[in-house]
Amino acid sequence: MGVAALPPSRCHQMSDLPDDFDCTITTWEYIYGLCRDVSDQVRDDDFEPDVVVALARGGWFAGRCLCDFLGLDDLTSLKMEHYVGTAEKSGEPSVRYPMPEGSVEGKDVLIIDDIADTGGSIERAYEYVTDRDAGEVRTATLQLLGTSEYQPDYVGERLAEWTWIVYPWNFIEDMVDLVSSVMGQADQESFTQEEIRHYLAEFHGIDRIEMEIAQPDRVPEVLDEMERRDVLESAGPGEWRLADG
């Protein structure tokens, strides 16, 4: 679905992307498996970190899993300001919420994030941590896009083609953005649930089978939440339109 025409990373405003940029829906089980793969690589490499630094927000789940797999109880977080919403960003990566003083001093550190597309966030995190008198610092991502200029030490999965990954922990957030986008692009006033599904498949390659296998029965939940947030409004029984303003 037009992946080759995409810009080199997803770090663009939604308006800068083609209408048909590709998306992939993931499951908790699949991502848990990637966490295990990363932990296996760390052990095979004989690296024994003292602390895991999980980049907020995408690295939190992976950070907790890695602590479990590696037998660690020292987990801290670092917030890098980059993405605002689906396919949107706010400038270059910078530290928004720094780590507590002394949290990595003299310790071997493993930094984990969910994905690297340009690699800017995790590279900046590496620089930040090493500047705080840490011991050995290594980096890991669950997934790595071929567009990344930074190569982490450990990678759960390498993705040759660009795609926007919809993770289980931000499913609602991403789907609100995506549904709003396809409704704005389609040339009609109101939409049934089936029409919304059709446009998700047409513009983003999210077909019904993929959605229902990965996140079963969740489209109605997304639409209800969009109504609650005043993004959508009822256009009659079983139909919705984008809310004004």
Regions found by a protein language model. Give the residues of each.
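PRPP-associated nucleotide enzymes
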Residues: 1-245
